[in-house]
Design a protein with these regions (language model features):
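Gram-negative bacterial Sec-dependent N-terminal signal peptides
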Residues: 1-27
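N-terminal, post-signal peptide beta-strand-biased segments of exported outer-membrane/organellar beta-barrel
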Residues: 23-134, 138, 172, 396, ...
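Outer-membrane beta-barrel porins/channels
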Residues: 27-40, 44, 116-461
């Protein structure tokens, strides 16, 4: 029997690659990760693109590498403890005669604990190349991980969402004068995506005029088909490799003031992989003639956003420094994601996101208590790119506030050990009212926040 194409498109729609970029371990707005420097995190990222002595400038502003006098290697690890829980209810076949409450719980703790590592190297050259400094860094600029219970009330909107971007950045800086340097870098980015959700085949069958009669045999209560009675499952996996670039400038108008600007390019990805469908045995014959909902290859194109960052560090005294940072992230690159399948009978699916550009602002400071210990703190506001009409169970995003503390122990002339704690919380309670065109509606709100614990070691040769 021919099942409506509209149901086919909508059922798989929730599996869009962009939907996987929704919420979770991402601890900056959208699916951005800023956890590339324990020192900078201790100031809520203030001064990340202008402060000296932090090898993560390879990606935060490669021009600052010119201020390094020694070859430096740095390893950072941040543990993200995300608390993320839904409160609300849902309706299957909303607005139709078959309407009924969605079964299932709140999905459990959708967050969890995840580690974000970073490794950086800065190498100042000597002799005739003394104005040139090289750098390399492995980092994760974007990512998320959320896992709901398989039978939760919002299972038709999303169950598992994993997205990982890993960058290898090779950079160089040139000192044009004692006060001014420029830097540039090439980015090789690897992306992996896994996402899944349940499919309410029962509602689709009952909503299609050609198969509605199956829902009333022998009656609407005991019939073989109906909303929530014939759930299937779908999982999409994909990978991609692509290239990007960044440039930076660092102006030091005095010995106490450092100003930085950094631009990171968009990176275009063609994520390709597989779409795997689990279809109930009593549903399979209905779709047999259509050739749909069978395992196939597929993928989607998406673009990670560009960023513009302004940074300032002012050494107010020999012991005290103030920092500030402002970053504009070009989330308007995420307007629509269209999934194309290798199976010619599986129609493309598309979803509008229409994200908006967003700002991140932070201020912070450092106090050098002694030759051995430096303390730091900072606060930040991270605006969400997601407006309420586009907020979903995969992205119940909201403006966020950062509250950060950190310290560095200079164990020797060559070795620094740093640690931080950051509390990230929503500026307001994110509410969702999601109506899927396949029939289900999810209404509720999210309680969420995150605790970040970071540790790093820096060694100067």
């Amino acid at each position: 029997m021919q099942v409506a194409t509209r149901f086919t498109q909508v059922s798989v729609l929730a599996l869009g690659i962009a939907a996987a970029m929704a919420s979770g371990q991402a601890q900056a707005a959208g699916f951005q990760l800023k956890e590339n420097s324990v020192k900078a995190q201790g100031r809520a990222m203030a001064g990340a693109g202008s402060a000296q002595g932090d090898a993560s400038v390879v990606v935060n502003n490669p021009a600052v590498m010119s201020t390094f006098a020694r070859t430096t290697v740095q390893a950072d690890v941040t543990a993200i403890d995300l608390s993320f829980e839904f409160r609300g209810s849902g309706t299957a076949a909303a607005g139709s005669p078959l309407q009924q409450p969605l079964s299932g719980g709140n999905g459990g703790q959708a967050g969890g604990l995840a580690a974000v590592p970073a490794l950086s190297l800065v190498v100042p050259l000597q002799d005739r190349f003394e104005y040139l400094t090289l750098g390399a860094m492995v980092s994760a600029p974007f990512g998320l991980a959320t896992h709901y219970d398989h039978d939760w009330v919002g299972r038709y909107h999303g169950v598992e969402s994993d997205l990982v971007f890993v960058d290898l950045t090779l950079a160089a800086s040139v000192e044009l004068s004692d006060r001014f340097s420029v830097g540039f870098g090439a980015i090789y980015e690897h992306a992996e995506a896994t996402l899944s959700n349940a499919i309410d085949f029962g509602t689709g069958i009952c909503a299609n005029p050609q198969t509605t009669s199956l829902c009333f045999l022998p009656n609407p209560v005991q019939g073989p088909y109906g909303p929530q009675r014939n759930d299937g499952f779908a999982t999409i996996n994909g990978t991609s490799n692509s290239l990007g670039w960044l440039v930076g400038m660092n102006w030091r108008p005095s010995d106490r003031l450092s100003l930085g600007y950094t631009y990171r390019s968009e990176i275009d990805h063609e994520i390709r992989g597989s779409a795997d469908f689990t279809v109930p045995a009593n549903v399979t014959p209905i779709f047999a003639s259509t050739g749909q909902f069978v395992d196939t290859g597929g993928g989607a194109d998406l673009t990670t956003p560009s960023t513009h960052s302004l940074s300032a560090t002012w050494q107010a005294s020999d012991r005290f420094a103030l920092m500030a940072e402002a970053t504009l992230t070009g989330w308007d690159s995420l307007e629509e994601v269209r999934i194309q399948y290798e199976n010619p009978r599986q129609p493309d699916t598309a979803e509008d996101y229409l994200w908006e550009d967003s700002w991140f602002y932070s201020v912070g400071g450092e106090y050098r208590f002694s030759d051995s210990f430096t303390f730091r703190a900072g606060v930040a506001r991270d605006d969400s790119p997601v407006s309420r009409p586009f907020r979903s169970s995969r992205l119940p995003d909201q403006d966020r506030m950062w509250y950060a503390l950190g310290l560095t122990w200079s164990a020797s002339e060559r070795l620094d050990i740093s640690a931080n704690y950051v509390r990230i919380q929503m500026a307001d309670t994110p509410e969702v009212d999601i109506r899927s065109t396949s029939g289900s509606r999810l209404v509720g709100e999210y309680d969420g926040g995150a605790d970040l614990y970071g540790i790093s070691a820096q060694y100067r040769f």
